């Protein structure tokens, strides 16, 4: 908003421009709340406290994997989606919790904020909408202050923002919006291009101006983007023209797997840097999900090519399902790792109670203590002895075969299927993580070597993220790359089931927009 204000002021000498309010929905709405309901900066719940609070709520409800950062993040996103859509929480289908669990977590989170006298960023929108809807004096005052409204990136607004906008703009309807439904890729956050497409139904006498020239990309790229996006049905019919002429190259490759793909890209970039005297910062590798960055990180580290990860520093190895498999491997290397024994002893379920685990959690010989100090049924004893034998076998395998053995012979995949069935959620995402983890172990001879590699990767990514001066190839997701531009772009994993992604809310349209935007980025 500061950038937009400075640009506006540079284009006009009218002193009244200084009186214009510039801001995001959150900042403008929070200003309204501060005026009418006496909120202040101290009222805002910071993200760290929010995550800690939700983590404690999940643990208090004995929800499995409550410590997992990705699970916590997913729950945060789902609560946000429900609020931004003005949904009844009972109608929402969570991808990580059962319906009952989600409702309980939602309610406890609301109580948690009330006890702390805090609001989060979603509340800024909800509470402003409710204020304007229920308080005529407040609505009239806001209308008198904001008689003219301009909204940029209108394709990205959500339901609560749109409903509040309609209240403020009515009855004069002096509203000017700029947007492109072809660039709406945030459906998972509640953004809806429908509000742009149906704008004329809500605001009469609308005048529409088509901005159909792209000044960023060359003709070859624009043509491909047009051919892709025209397959969408939920859009205004238009053909984007090129304002840059021709001269770009668009190449396609068909690698056998993610490793071969990463090696090809790494070699291609290295050759271009050496031959053309370009910089590593001139290159970006863009992917649909963070999981896909795993092979890139491995290969670029091995080839000593500098890179910058723009998204979360959480790696595939941090996911709870991957951590379960790695716990099995760590036990193979160190059978005295009680923490890892406790993690996997009931994955799959082996009917060992929490009381028994608490009784022996600090014992030096976990398995012997479990058998001899706990009151186990003979069938349980046999199960534990069989597990001990299996672990001894696993430690002699190479890591890829060891992971395969854990998934099949030790029934970890069956545990995942049961876990998803009990929660009525799809298995695709978790199986994808396990497949990628198994693939990551391909080139290692011993489990110890593989585990050491994982620690190096995690350390490298943390250092990479903390080093603000790192010069290197950009690794980023499509969503994080929106609005940026690069000289050379590689889009990886353009496979059915990845782009469009199986978990996508609007597979037919929104995922084509991802590809179209990435094509135009070059």
List the predicted regions and their residue ranges:
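P-loop NTPase Walker
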Residues: 1-40, 140, 194, 223-226
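Conserved beta-strand -> loop -> alpha-helix junction used to position metal-binding or nucleic-acid-contacting
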Residues: 17-32, 303-327
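Short, polar/flexible loop-turn hinges at active-site or ligand-entry regions and domain interfaces
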Residues: 12-19, 35-47, 57-70, 86-97, ...
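Short glycine-/polar-rich loops that comprise or flank the Walker A/P-loop
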Residues: 17-20, 171-174, 180-182, 203-208, ...
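Conserved helicase NTPase motor core
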Residues: 21, 46-50, 54, 96-198, ...
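Proline-centered turn/helix-capping motifs that create local helix->coil transitions or kinks
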Residues: 87, 173, 228-238, 399, ...
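Helicase P-loop NTPase motor core
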Residues: 204-207, 212-306, 332-334, 396-397
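Conserved helicase C-terminal RecA-like lobe
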Residues: 95, 297-298, 327-522
